[in-house]
Amino acid sequence: MTSNAAVTSVLASIWIAKQFPRDLAEVTTRMNQACSRLTLAQSATYAFPRGGTTVEGPSIRLAEALIGAWGNAEAGWKEVARHWDPKGADGKGCMVSECVAFCFDKETNVRREISFTVNHTRDKNEYEGGRKVMKRVALESERDVYELCANMASRRIRACILQVLPGWLTEEALEVVGRTLESGDKRSLPDMIRSMEAKFREYGVTRAQLEKNLGHGLEETTKPEIIRLGKVFNSIAEGLVRVKDVFPRDEQSQTKEPDIPSVSPASPSVPSPIVEDGIPGLDVPEDVPSFGSFEH
């Protein structure tokens, strides 16, 4: 698309948004409908320990649902440039993508952007002198590059969305999500406990580790504890936190801690990002996103 065509497309979408402004009553209704679905509620929040406290907040999945309910808005990311970094990949050199995550409310003309760079590298374990050494190697596949950039963009998109959306909408959504988690699951408590144990087992978490985290036998688990562990599971499944950070093994255990699986075998691992304080949604590591950009 040429620059003139792109400008025309943006102006047209803004004009349409002005002609059909959002109805806050409809926004609230759509938000309630989305957050009342158990599948969304179960993935709507994350929680993980950090510095002796628990970090908790809305996930990218909830942010997607809310910007959809808000309407007349667009959010996503784009790559704007690439350049060569001779110092990347442990001094061997690599390409670097310059990207922008954004959220644009076309009706109010409010736009938030976050620029970031992504080195085209991945971690690779190598053995030197009988010791395992972590090294950075350059990516060659365009698919790997795209997935890495999308991964790095995810929490920045969430941050942009949360800055554009009014705070009351996010707060009400979290309240609805909480009620859905409390009353939306009609299974018996023993069935919920067995399901929870099976899910954690996929990531190498044993029954003993769950019981140590809970402080009592698994059969004594309560509904609020299942909800809390569900948020922890979301954090582990999305790569926000490592299994061993939440469920440490005994020092005498000889069992190797399994790595958190990535989205696909070809997906590169992503380095832990630097915490960026002061911007909502930027206090957690990367999510695995499901989109490049979307409009509502």
Predicted regions and their residues:
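Long, low-complexity intrinsically disordered segments
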Residues: 247-279
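Long, low-complexity, intrinsically disordered segments
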Residues: 271-296
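Polyanion-binding surfaces on beta-sheet-dominated domains and ring/shell assemblies
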Residues: 1-97, 102-259
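Intrinsic disorder/low-structure terminal segments
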Residues: 115, 246, 266, 290-293
